[in-house]
Amino acid sequence: MPQYKENVYSEWAPNEKVAAEAAIGASIAGVRSFCAMKHVGLNVAADPVFTVAYTGVTGGLVIISADDPGQHSSQNEQDNRNYAKAARLLMLEPSSSQECKDYMKMAFALSEKFDAPVLFHVTTRVCHSKGIVELGERVEADYIPYEKKITKYVSAPANAKKMRVNLETKLQMMEEYANTCEINQPEWHDKKIGVVTSGISYQYAKETFGENASYLKLGMTLPTAN
């Protein structure tokens, strides 16, 4: 981040809840923002994260959750994909270093497209992976001027009930997108075995079966495609 200090503002937060609230505030103000935390940190940040799913965003908002299957350096092995389901969040799951870069760009675009936060779900082996990554040209995101929208961002019951209905409409649109998006596609090889994968499980399956199986590789795993 120090390489881009003239263009990108970053800070440490006292805890994950504060980090999420700061990122949400930046999004409301009209800029793209993200906060990153390990899996147990999302427990701390759950309060604002559940609510921003209702309110939506202005600038793109991405919440990175790093899970730790196998408990290599964590106090539990919780699966934060369940948070995405409970909070009704759009979720992306990259399987490689290249996809981490590509999906992050997509996450901001989808956040703004659907007026919704995106949970960017990674795991230990993805976070510790190394690989050659093609970066491409830097693209500056447009600043969206702040507008005072009480009915959108003040989640008092009178507003929140309407937000809840609106959220279901957005989720239906996300599901339709998931059915055809380029990161949810079959990979055909031998058709005797089929494996449905997401995240690092795609790499494990390919290492085990190679071309002796076909794969349905899901990069956008929630809302679930029908």
Q: What are these model-derived regions, one by one?
A:
Residues P94-N226:
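Flexible, low-complexity linker and terminal segments
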Residues M1-S97, R125, E182, W188-K192, ...:
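Thiamine diphosphate
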